[in-house]
Design a protein with these regions (language model features):
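Active-site cofactor/cluster-binding pocket
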Residues: 1-190, 195-203
């Protein structure tokens, strides 16, 4: 296996908060020929991430605000689904934030931003959004995780296998479609509704 470390920072709010998960993976043996072992970080460093993943668009905005992305290095995978904030809901008129501004910032501040409605894909598969996110991560090719190995891990869990595999497949295919659509002339990204939390990964 490969050396890997995962940590999480729980969100803090009056009732709830988004938890940020951080993962570092070294695509090399645990100990090199000179006997040196890797030393991993416990939390993400701004501008030092290869991959940032978010299951809700406003969480993507928070990652952008924190300066986690680098326009020469970071690939962003984000759902365009939304969980409206209290500030948005309490407006008498349409108080929703301008999602186009977030999407444009995501494109400008990352090496590549792949955005699509993963919450809708999760609902269609009858599963949770994490399965769809897993498929999108696998499709990115940034981590040494072949699709077959990812699907074998899902089967090995023994819980909600059919639904999770369906969500994984939708995430994988959705990433490919969104990447192709983004590269086509005169096309952009769409928006939708949904809920979720933010996540980050670095290598």
């Amino acid at each position: 296996g490969l050396p890997v470390q995962a940590t999480s920072v729980p969100g803090v709010a009056q009732r709830t908060g988004a938890t940020s998960y951080y993962l570092e993976l070294l695509p090399a043996p645990m100990v090199d020929r000179e006997g040196r072992a890797p030393v991993f970080c416990l939390s993400p460093t701004s501008g030092d991430l290869d991959l940032v993943v978010s299951s809700e668009l406003l969480e993507t905005a928070r990652a952008l605000e924190r300066g986690l992305l680098d326009e020469t290095r970071t690939v962003l995978i984000s759902s365009t689904g939304r969980a409206l904030t209290v500030a948005e809901k309490m407006q008498q008129a349409d108080g929703r934030f301008d999602l186009g501004r977030i999407e444009r910032a995501a494109q400008a501040l990352s090496r590549e931003a792949v955005l699509f409605d993963m919450q809708a894909e999760a609902r269609a598969a009858g599963t949770v959004i994490s399965s769809v996110l897993f498929g999108a991560i696998a499709a990115s090719g940034l981590l040494p995780l072949p699709r077959a190995a990812c699907e074998a891990t899902i089967r090995g869990s023994g819980r909600g296998v059919a639904q999770s595999l369906a969500g994984f497949s939708r995430g994988f295919d959705g990433f490919v479609r969104a990447r192709v659509a983004r590269s086509a002339p005169g096309t952009g990204t769409g928006t939708g509704t949904g809920t979720g939390t933010g996540a980050g990964a670095g290598a």
